[in-house]
Regions:
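A short beta-strand-loop structural module common to alpha/beta enzyme folds
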Residues: 26-42, 180-184
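Short, charged, surface-exposed secondary-structure boundary motifs
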Residues: 37-43, 91-98, 162, 190-191
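Long, charge-dense
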Residues: 78-124
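Gly/Ser/Thr-rich loops at beta-strand to alpha-helix junctions
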Residues: 7-14, 36-37, 61-73, 88-89, ...
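N-terminal basic/disordered segments at the start of proteins
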Residues: 1-23
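Short, well-structured alpha-helical segments in soluble
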Residues: 45-57
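C-terminal accessory domains and tails appended to enzymatic cores
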Residues: 182-224
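Active-site rim beta-loop-alpha module in soluble metabolic enzymes
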Residues: 105-173, 182
Length: 224
């Protein structure tokens, strides 16, 4: 068994499992709690603890969490080299290798993100049941101001129909549009097959992940 360890955002679970099967990765795989998404500081602390507690013979720790909320900035490779995707967030991870330009002012979904939304305070289905459709629509228009374009990222690892059925009521509330975009998640293949190029951040043992590793990457932009 490999002495490599993966710690991944749970929203990438199906895609990562597909890459594991394709590459034959045989190391440890751990999925982080979805609750960490709402607290970058806690995400950072949890990741650092996992790194610090890795076995002395660990060859590499692969962190499938990117620049999300700067949660990975400052991570110290105390026990083993680190490898991370050079991306702003999980959306960029999923779009990597597809050749698609990330649309501005857009909301992106997969089944993983749908499940995250359902468990959050922004679950429109729950809000409709509690407040009614009209009050929910008013609230959502305030929350999603500037965002009307929705994209389902089709990574061909799940059925997109339930995602469409879930999100369409929200799209209609916002007078928005729903489109599909292809997701190749190529950087996950690079992380697992050992490719270390410009798309991968490599931190040697004893090093620290500096914020400059994300220079040139563009955060989400609200459409004018």
């Amino acid at each position: 068994m490999s002495k490599r360890i993966i710690y991944s955002c749970v929203t990438l679970k199906k895609e990562l499992e597909n890459v594991i099967a394709a590459t034959g990765f045989d190391g440890e795989v751990h999925f982080l709690s979805e609750k960490l998404h709402s607290s970058p500081q806690t995400m950072h602390q949890v990741l650092q603890q996992h790194i610090d507690e890795a076995a002395p013979d660990t060859e590499e720790i692969i962190i499938c969490v990117s620049g999300c909320g700067k949660s990975t900035v400052g991570l110290k490779a105390t026990t083993a080299p680190l490898a991370l995707p050079r991306t702003m967030d999980c959306i960029d991870v999923l779009l990597s290798g597809s050749g698609a330009k990330r649309p501005e002012g857009a909301i992106f979904l997969t089944d993983g993100w749908m499940n995250f939304m359902k468990a959050s305070a922004l679950n429109h289905e729950k809000m409709i049941a509690e407040k009614g459709a009209e009050a929910t629509a008013e609230t959502m228009r305030k929350i999603y101001r500037g965002f009307t374009d929705f994209y389902i990222i089709d990574t061909h690892t799940y059925d997109t129909t339930p995602v469409k059925e879930y999100i369409m009521p929200l799209v209609e509330m916002l007078d928005g549009t729903l489109n599909y975009i292809d997701g190749k998640y190529q950087v996950l293949y690079k992380l697992l097959d050992g490719t270390r190029d410009k798309d991968v951040i490599s931190i040697p043992k004893g090093g620290v992940l500096d914020i400059s590793e994300f220079d040139g990457l563009r955060p989400a932009v609200i459409k004018k």
